[in-house]
C-alpha cells in the first residue's frame, strides 16, 4: 500500500545545542561555525558573489541534495537579498532553490535549530511560517513576495530525482552537494545521483561539496563534471568544486507528454474567474505582459462566483496521481491564500466529510488507510463529530483540520484588482469567437468583429473552452449546478465546520448571516436559470443524509435565493493544464504509438496556445497550484510536480492513454 506520510527526522540536540541525527550519527551543521562553513563551501565554492551581478537571466536556480535545517538556503537567501540591494538594476531578479529531504524536521525542531543564527532570523521566520506538512513530493513555497521560490521535495533523493519532469533538465546554475557524510549515509552518494546532477546542470553550471572523497570526485567526473580540489573550511584539508563544461544529450522517455514553453513574454488570457486571476499574478511575477479578456461585464460571474466554497483535498486510495496533486495542491492553496495581500471572506474552520451511508463509510475507511499526516486528515468518531462541528449527525467521518471555506467571488475580484496594480490590462464584455495564427502570433476575433493580436494565448474560460476549432475535440464536459443561499437559524448557527455528505453545508458567513448548501449536479447541461426542484433537492439531500437531525429540518429555501453556475469537468476528476494539443496531428503522429514508442515524436500541440481548464468542483483547491505549474511551464522554469502527476494533468492524456494501448480515439 502506498503511504502518503513522510517520516520526520529522528534527532537530538547535543551539549552545544547542535542537532544530531540519531539514525546517521552525524551533526546537521558544524559545532564550530556552521554558518561560515556554508558561506565558504557552497556560496564560495560556486563563486556566487561574483556570478550574481553577471548572470544573464532573471532567474538563478540552485539545487541541493539535503535540506536539513535549511542553513544553506537561509544563508544563500540572505546573500541574494544583499546582492539585490547592492545591484537593483541587475538582470537577475529572482532566486529559485530546489532541495531534497528524506527526513524533514518538524516545525518545532526547525525553529529550535534556527536559534543558532539570530542574524538569519528575518529569513528563518518566513521559512518556519510556511513549513509544509510531511507529505511526499514537491512543496513550493513562495517567499519574499515571490522573489524567492523554494521547492522542497520530501522523500528519498535517489527515487525522487528519477521522477523529475524534463522541465528541470539543464536548468540548475549551481549545485550544493550536501548531506550527512558519505561514510555515515552511503545510500545517498550514488552514481545515479551524480548522473542526475549532470543532467539537471546548465552548461556552465557549477557544484560544490564539503567532501573530498575520491569516489565522489570520480563519480562526478564520470557523470560529466570537470572537478577540482579546493582548500577545505577550517580544519578540513580539502573540498570539491566542479563545473559542467559540456552540453549533455537529453533523451526523453515520454515525448507524448512533453511540455513546451514560450520564448515570448506577452500573453492574452481568456476568462474571468479564479483560474485567470491566479494565473495573471503568477505570470506578472515572472515579468510577463498580461492582458485579460472577459466575456462578462465583471469578473467572477461564472463558476467562480459563489458566495462560499469549501476548501479541502480530493483523495482516493486507488489513484496516486489524484492524491499527489490534490494533497499538495491543497497545502499550496492554503499557503498562497494566507500570503495574498487581499481581503476576502473566509474561515479556516475545518471540513468534516461524513460517512452517511455504507458506500461513503467504505470510501472514508479507504482514505484513512493511506497513512495520511494528521495535519492533513484525521478520523473522527460519531460521538466526536458534534464536538468539532457543533451539530449532531450520528455519523463518523474524516476531518480536514486545515480546510474551511472562502468566498470565491470576492477572492477573484480582489486578486484581479491586485494584478491590475501590477500591470494587468483587463477588457470586459469581450466574447472570443475565433482564434487563428497570423505572422507568428494569435489573431483573436471577438463578438462585434473586434480583433486583437497577441504572442501567446491561454484559454481559461471554463465550460466554454471547447468552442474553438483548436479545442473542439477535447474530452471535457459541462456540469450545471445550483447552490442555495439559506438564512441562518439558532440551530444552524451552531455549525462550526463545513459539512460534506451527499452535498455540502457551510457555516454561516458573519458578513451576511447566510449559509450555502449545494449543489445540484447536471452533467452535460449549461442551464443557469433558477430551478425550484434543485432548490428543494438541496434541502432534501441534507435531511435524507441526517434523518434524525432536527437542525437539518430548519433549513429554509423558500426565499428562492440561489446561484446557478456551470463547471467544466473531466471523467478522471483532474484538471487539464498545459499546451493545447492538436487532435488531428496527434492521431496522425501517434497512429502506431503502441508498437513504435521508441520512434515517437514530441506531443503535437498548437504553438504558444495554452489551456487552464476542467477544475470541476475543486477549483479552490486546484487552481493555485495549476496556475503555478502553467506559469512555470510557459516561462521555461522548473515545475513543482513529478513527471507522472504532470502527465495526469496533460490535456492530451486521455487520447494518449488509449493510443499507447492501441485503442481507437474519438473526439470529445
From Swiss-Prot:
Region (tRNA (mnm(5)s(2)U34)-methyltransferase): 1-245
GO biological process: methylation; tRNA wobble uridine modification
EC numbers on record: 2.1.1.61, 1.5.-.-
Pfam families from the UniProt entry: DAO, Methyltransf_30
GO cellular component, one term: cytoplasm
Keyword terms, alphabetized: Cytoplasm, FAD, Flavoprotein, Methyltransferase, Multifunctional enzyme, Oxidoreductase, S-adenosyl-L-methionine, Transferase, tRNA processing
Annotated compartments: Cytoplasm
Chain positions covered by the region annotation FAD-dependent cmnm(5)s(2)U34 oxidoreductase: 270-668
Listed InterPro entries: FAD-dep_OxRdtase, FAD/NAD-bd_sf, MnmC-like_methylTransf, SAM-dependent_MTases_sf, tRNA_MAMT_biosynth_bifunc_MnmC, tRNA_MNMC2, tRNA_S-uridine_synth_MnmC_C
Protein family: In the N-terminal section; belongs to the methyltransferase superfamily. tRNA (mnm(5)s(2)U34)-methyltransferase family.
Stated role: Catalyzes the last two steps in the biosynthesis of 5-methylaminomethyl-2-thiouridine (mnm(5)s(2)U) at the wobble position (U34) in tRNA. Catalyzes the FAD-dependent demodification of cmnm(5)s(2)U34 to nm(5)s(2)U34, followed by the transfer of a methyl group from S-adenosyl-L-methionine to nm(5)s(2)U34, to form mnm(5)s(2)U34.
Protein name per Swiss-Prot or TrEMBL: tRNA 5-methylaminomethyl-2-thiouridine biosynthesis bifunctional protein MnmC
Organism in which the protein naturally occurs: Escherichia coli O157:H7
Gene behind the chain: mnmC
Amino acid at each position: 500500500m502506498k503511504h502518503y506520510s513522510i517520516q520526520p527526522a529522528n534527532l537530538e540536540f547535543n551539549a552545544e545545542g547542535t542537532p544530531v541525527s540519531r539514525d546517521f550519527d552525524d551533526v546537521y551543521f558544524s559545532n564550530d561555525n556552521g554558518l561560515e562553513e556554508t558561506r565558504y563551501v557552497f556560496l564560495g565554492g560556486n563563486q556566487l558573489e561574483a556570478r550574481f551581478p553577471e548572470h544573464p537571466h532573471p532567474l538563478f536556480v540552485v539545487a541541493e541534495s539535503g535540506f536539513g535545517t535549511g542553513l544553506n538556503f537561509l544563508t544563500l537567501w540572505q546573500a541574494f537579498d544583499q546582492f539585490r540591494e547592492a545591484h537593483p538594476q541587475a538582470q537577475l531578479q529572482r532566486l529559485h532553490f530546489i532541495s531534497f529531504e528524506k527526513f524533514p524536521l518538524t516545525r518545532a525542531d526547525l525553529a529550535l535549530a534556527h536559534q543558532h543564527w539570530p542574524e538569519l532570523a528575518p529569513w528563518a521566520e518566513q521559512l518556519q511560517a510556511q513549513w509544509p506538512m510531511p507529505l511526499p513530493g514537491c512543496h513550493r513555497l513562495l517567499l519574499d513576495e515571490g522573489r524567492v521560490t523554494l521547492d522542497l521535495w520530501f522523500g528519498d533523493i535517489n527515487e525522487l530525482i528519477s521522477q523529475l519532469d524534463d522541465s528541470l533538465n539543464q536548468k540548475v546554475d549551481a549545485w550544493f552537494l550536501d548531506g550527512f557524510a558519505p561514510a555515515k549515509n552511503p545510500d545517498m552518494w550514488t552514481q545515479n545521483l551524480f548522473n542526475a546532477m549532470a543532467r539537471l546542470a546548465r552548461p556552465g553550471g557549477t557544484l560544490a561539496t564539503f567532501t573530498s572523497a575520491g569516489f565522489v570526485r570520480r563519480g562526478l567526473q564520470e557523470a560529466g563534471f570537470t572537478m577540482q580540489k579546493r582548500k577545505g573550511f577550517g580544519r578540513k584539508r580539502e573540498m570539491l568544486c566542479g563545473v559542467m563544461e559540456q552540453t549533455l544529450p537529453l533523451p526523453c522517455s515520454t515525448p507524448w507528454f512533453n511540455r513546451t514553453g514560450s520564448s515570448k513574454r506577452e500573453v492574452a488570457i481568456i476568462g474571468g474567474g479564479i483560474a485567470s486571476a491566479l494565473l495573471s499574478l503568477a505570470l506578472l511575477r515572472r515579468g510577463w505582459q498580461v492582458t485579460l479578456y472577459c466575456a462578462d461585464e465583471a469578473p467572477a460571474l461564472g463558476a467562480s462566483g459563489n458566495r462560499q466554497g469549501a476548501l479541502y483535498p480530493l483523495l482516493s486510495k486507488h489513484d496516486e496521481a489524484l492524491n499527489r496533486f490534490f494533497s499538495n495542491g491543497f497545502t499550496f492553496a492554503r499557503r498562497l491564500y494566507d500570503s495574498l495581500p487581499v481581503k476576502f471572506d473566509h474561515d479556516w474552520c475545518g471540513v468534516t466529510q461524513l460517512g452517511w451511508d455504507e458506500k461513503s463509510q467504505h470510501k472514508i475507511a479507504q482514505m484513512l488507510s493511506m497513512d495520511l499526516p494528521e495535519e492533513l486528515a484525521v478520523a473522527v468518531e460519531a460521538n466526536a463529530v458534534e464536538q468539532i462541528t457543533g451539530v449532531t449527525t450520528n455519523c463518523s467521518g474524516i476531518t480536514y483540520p486545515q480546510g474551511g471555506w472562502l468566498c470565491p467571488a470576492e477572492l477573484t475580484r480582489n486578486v484581479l484588482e491586485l494584478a491590475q496594480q501590477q500591470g494587468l490590462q483587463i477588457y470586459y464584455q469581450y466574447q472570443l469567437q475565433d482564434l487563428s495564427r497570423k505572422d507568428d502570433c494569435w489573431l483573436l476575433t471577438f463578438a462585434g468583429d473586434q480583433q486583437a493580436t497577441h504572442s501567446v494565448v491561454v484559454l481559461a474560460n471554463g465550460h466554454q473552452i471547447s468552442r474553438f476549432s483548436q479545442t473542439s475535440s477535447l474530452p471535457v464536459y459541462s456540469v450545471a449546478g445550483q447552490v442555495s443561499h439559506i438564512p441562518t437559524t439558532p440551530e444552524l448557527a451552531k455549525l462550526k465546520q463545513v459539512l460534506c455528505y451527499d452535498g455540502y453545508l457551510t457555516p454561516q458567513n458573519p458578513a451576511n448571516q447566510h449559509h450555502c448548501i449545494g449543489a445540484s449536479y447536471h452533467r452535460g447541461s449549461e442551464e443557469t436559470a433558477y430551478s425550484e426542484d434543485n432548490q428543494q433537492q438541496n434541502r432534501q439531500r441534507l435531511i435524507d443524509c441526517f434523518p434524525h437531525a432536527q437542525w437539518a429540518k430548519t433549513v429554509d429555501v423558500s426565499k428562492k435565493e440561489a446561484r446557478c453556475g456551470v463547471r467544466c469537468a473531466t471523467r478522471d476528476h483532474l484538471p487539464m493544464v498545459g499546451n493545447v494539443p492538436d487532435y488531428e496531428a496527434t492521431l496522425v503522429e501517434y497512429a502506431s504509438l503502441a508498437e513504435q514508442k521508441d520512434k515517437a515524436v514530441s506531443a503535437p500541440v498548437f504553438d504558444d496556445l495554452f489551456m487552464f481548464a476542467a477544475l470541476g468542483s475543486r477549483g479552490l483547491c486546484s487552481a493555485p497550484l495549476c496556475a503555478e505549474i502553467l506559469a512555470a511551464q510557459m516561462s521555461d522554469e522548473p515545475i513543482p510536480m513529478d513527471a507522472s502527476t504532470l502527465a495526469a494533468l496533460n490535456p492530451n492524456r486521455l487520447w494518449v492513454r488509449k493510443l499507447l494501448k492501441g485503442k481507437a480515439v474519438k473526439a470529445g
